[in-house]
């Protein structure tokens, strides 16, 4: 199995699915009618184990071959569709097929595209099972937070499973000479989220100050968090939510922005701008 930065589990594993179902059932039974719960947030950034959302274990290899057999029926049909004879990649046995990875074939375009489709469908099915479990004792709406234009997952199909669309918005403000291209990109993403279901969505995550994954992470200039938040509202978001409430004391996201900084002060600019947005949204 090839693990990356997080989500170190197999979405095909029957054991993982059963354990997850039991946890979801307990949550549904305990909190499904609680007046303080208004929405089920399923998982967090499905597929967020970095770039390809993939697990490459033997269970996934078997499931992938089964998926391919259902789609193509015969190896001749698969070889023709992938045009695998080029560079002598013709398959003569289903067991010869493995997921594209640094440990094997990763230049066959048909293989890579079908693997992406398989991964998206497997994760969507995993999500579907979680939704079914939490709705056992509850009729609350469900969502899961999408990640911009995260290509490994087919969000158009995922939208069919969700009651509410939500996404994590992190425009790269102040990285270009002109803010307009970034603003246009952000507007496009908000419009896409609204377009999935033709109704308002939730901005599940945003940063009040800075991110932590670029080579240079710029703090939002005075007023930019306000402008960015109001842009989201104007384009269909029903929320301005932040990751994270308090800065982490360590590990990968210790420098990621938060409402409460390491100084735990209410007097700094970031906290004051968050409060400003909150007051205006109450009007």
Which positions does each model-derived feature cover?
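Polysaccharide-binding and catalytic clefts of secreted carbohydrate-active enzymes
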Residues: 4-164, 168-175, 179-188
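Carbohydrate-binding surfaces of carbohydrate-active enzymes
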Residues: 90, 94-97, 162-163, 170-283
């Amino acid at each position: 199995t090839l693990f990356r930065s997080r989500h170190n589990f197999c979405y095909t594993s029957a054991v993982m699915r059963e354990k997850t179902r039991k946890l979801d059932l307990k949550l549904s039974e305990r909190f499904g009618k609680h007046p303080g719960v208004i929405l089920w947030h399923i998982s967090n950034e499905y597929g967020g184990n970095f770039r390809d959302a993939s697990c490459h274990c033997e269970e996934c290899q078997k499931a992938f071959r089964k998926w391919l057999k259902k789609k193509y029926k015969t190896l001749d049909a698969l070889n023709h569709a992938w045009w695998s004879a080029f560079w002598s990649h013709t398959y003569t046995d289903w067991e010869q097929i493995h997921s594209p990875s640094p440990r094997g074939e990763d230049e066959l375009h048909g293989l890579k595209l079908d693997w992406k489709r398989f991964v998206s469908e497997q994760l969507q099915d995993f999500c579907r099972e979680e939704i079914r479990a939490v709705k056992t004792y509850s009729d609350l709406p469900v969502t899961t937070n999408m990640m911009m234009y995260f290509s490994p997952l087919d969000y158009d199909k995922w939208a069919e499973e969700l009651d509410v669309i939500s996404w994590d918005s992190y425009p790269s403000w102040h990285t270009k000479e002109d803010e307009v291209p970034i603003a246009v990109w952000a507007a496009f993403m908000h419009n896409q989220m609204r377009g999935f279901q033709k109704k308002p969505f939730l901005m599940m995550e945003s940063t009040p100050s800075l991110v932590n994954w670029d080579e240079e992470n710029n703090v939002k200039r005075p007023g930019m968090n306000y402008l960015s938040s109001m842009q989201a509202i104007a384009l269909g978001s029903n929320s301005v939510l932040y990751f994270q409430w308090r800065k982490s004391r360590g590990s990968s996201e210790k420098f990621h922005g938060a409402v409460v900084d390491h100084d735990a002060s209410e007097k700094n600019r970031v906290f004051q701008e968050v409060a400003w947005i909150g007051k205006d949204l109450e009007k």
